[in-house]
UniProtKB/Swiss-Prot annotation:
Protein family: Belongs to the eukaryotic ribosomal protein eS17 family.
Protein name from the UniProt record: Small ribosomal subunit protein eS17
SS bond list: none
PANTHER family xrefs: 40S RIBOSOMAL PROTEIN S17
PROSITE patterns xrefs: RIBOSOMAL_S17E
Length: 63
């Protein structure tokens, strides 16, 4: 079984996908850079978790 992401990570990721869907891709590294530019996220670890969630959401949209 996989790990469950915390609610605030999901909420932040869904807000970012809603606002910046045109800038986000299915590539994790690109999404990290975009999130750095558009969002105020306190730590690198939290940014990476949000970027991973956003990447997963974008892959579902493409499928």
């Amino acid at each position: 079984m996989g790990r469950i992401r915390q609610t605030f990570i999901k909420r932040a990721g869904e807000d970012l996908v809603e606002k910046y869907e045109d800038r986000l891709t299915t590539d994790f590294e690109t999404n990290k850079k975009v999130i750095d530019e558009v969002a105020e996220i306190a730590t690198k670890r939290l940014r990476n978790r949000v970027a991973g969630y956003v990447t997963k959401k974008m892959k579902k949209v493409d499928a």
